Amino acid sequence: MKHWIQENYKNRSWAGELNESQEGKQIVLFGWSFRFRDQGGVIFIDLRDRTGIIQVVARKELLGDSFTLAEKVRSEYVLAVRGTLKKRDLESINPRMQTGTIEVVLDQLEILNVAKTPPFSLDEFDEVSEELKLKYRYLDFRREELKNRMIKRHEFIFAIRNYLNKRKFVEIETPILNKSTPEGARDFLVPSRLNPNQFYALPQSPQIFKQILMVGGMERYFQIVKCFRDEDLRADRQPEFTQLDMEFSFVSQEEILSEIEGLVETIYKEVFNIQLSIPFPRMTYNTAMEEYGSDKPDLRFGMKLVDVSEIVKDCDFNVFAGAVKNGGTVKVVCVPGGSIISRKEIEDYTAWLNRDYKAKGLAYMKHGTEGLESTITKRFKKEELEAISKACGSKEGDMLFFGADEREIVNHSLGALRLKLSERFETPKENEINITWIVDFPMFEWNKDHKRWDALHHPFTSPSDESIPFFESMETLQKNAGNATAKAYDLVMNGVEIGGGSIRIHSREIQNKVFQILGINEEEAKEKFGFLLEALEFGAPPHGGLAFGIDRMLMLLTGGKSIRDVIAFPKTQKGLCLMSECPSPVEEKQLQELKIKLAKV
């Protein structure tokens, strides 16, 4: 390697930072040849590094015999170049390039490495299948989209650390090898060689450890942490993902929400130049479910669910009247301009809602020139139809869809339909951001399949002040479990939950009662959470916290379609890494050391 190259590694210039003020200066650059054009005696090379692209010009009369080296350059060759920065002629200015008014005229060129022809175009405007990009992830990094998202990810996390450091938070790493407590998703298990037939679990969250840190007096903790869940994957799920995990001592829910609002406002402004207005709006869990059919409502558009049970309870349409009589509900969602929806589309919606949400049917009415029209409107009095139209604010050209069933089925099915139809009829404005707190969650939810109470968030969530009397005895708790609310809160952005948390239980007595109502007996509680329960007896302060999904936030803020778009080396929806080809078999010797024998599948 020529001496001028090694001497200039630390003195290099960055392509994207060059400008006209450096005209006449000698420039040293390192990077990859993105494009090249041979025009006979003059070769133009678009040299790309992490910061951008600059045009370098190789002229035969200046390079002499070295010009033959420039003729060998091909796509993605690794180059070292030295030359003089000059302004381009007016006719050769490229307004689409950040450095389109300048170029570097070469006096030295070295090919540091050659490259095979890439299996796909690295031009950001060319479409490439996700499978191919995941297999050759190292090439995808050279494309503008992924590279820029990785840089934004770095800036985002750096801004978080900087802000929290100023707010007296301490970053502490919690264990990756942990105890299995399979309360939610499946754990990833790691066999212990030194302790045969014993297993570690990769953490689904640092929940217990951060509470232990509060007992230990650390008071303000945060961590950018990897978490692991062995679950079926969707667009916004990965087996390993990154959270901003936080915990505070001696705080109320109000103080936590205020602290988080300051953090979010600051990092959105610093990294994405997005100006947010704080405090964020708040909505109760009950309102979210009743009006939007979701605990993470997208509030960028209307189409609320409207309860018309009182209007239709005495109508002649038995599907509606019967649902109300049996303790259910009837709701309607009005779709602006939806009268163009075809019967075939309605049949498809009906089948989908039946399959995925157990909805028994999907009644509908169109708002025509004479009011509401449908095959079922003859079963309603004129006043009833007018009252339905008034309740949901329908006008000519709109379509009304009805759900009539148990309240939970109606809310979930119409909530899902609302989201699907918004894509066509009430598409949110591009770059619009709506952030809302969802508060006053139920503490428990009834599991119909297992006939038991489950924690809506997790077993360590504190009851609200209004619900504390329910915990005076197990008898009162059994009677009122369905009415107990929690000091829990979720932060929702554009219909996606980006963070959530709660005030924690710091009383051993209340924690024991929560375990009991969840069907966790004393022995099981001690086995799974014994060290936390013991810690609560050594002066646990009032504390609470939350966790943000870093990947989800970045997906939304960078316009990604999936969190795979903002993770450096993501897995597919089958949990595979196409680049490294993992998971993979291991040698028999390794299994023997772990005392593991494989079962045939």
From Swiss-Prot:
- Spell out the InterPro entries in the cross-references: Aa-tRNA-synt_II, aa-tRNA-synth_II, aa-tRNA-synth_II/BPL/LPL, Asp-tRNA-ligase_1, Asp-tRNA-ligase_1_N, Asp/Asn-tRNA-synth_IIb, AspRS_core, GAD-like_sf
Subcellular localization? Cytoplasm
Q: Which UniProt keywords apply?
A: Aminoacyl-tRNA synthetase, ATP-binding, Cytoplasm, Ligase, Nucleotide-binding, Protein biosynthesis
Per the record, the GO terms for biological process are: aspartyl-tRNA aminoacylation
Q: Where does L-aspartate bind?
A: E183, R229, H457, R504
**What GO terms fall under cellular component here?**
cytoplasm
Instruction: Please verify whether the record's keywords include Transcription.
Output: no
A Pfam family that the UniProt record links to this protein: GAD
Q: Which domain of life is it from?
A: Bacteria
Residues the entry annotates as binding ATP: R229, D230, E231, Q238, E497, G549, I550, D551, R552
Protein EC: 6.1.1.12
Which interval of the chain is the signal sequence?
Answer: none
A GO MF term: ATP binding
Summary of subunit composition and partner proteins: Homodimer.
- Give the family per the record: Belongs to the class-II aminoacyl-tRNA synthetase family. Type 1 subfamily.
The task this protein performs is described as:
Catalyzes the attachment of L-aspartate to tRNA(Asp) in a two-step reaction: L-aspartate is first activated by ATP to form Asp-AMP and then transferred to the acceptor end of tRNA(Asp).
Protein name as catalogued: Aspartate--tRNA ligase
Source organism per entry reads Leptospira interrogans serogroup Icterohaemorrhagiae serovar Lai (strain 56601)
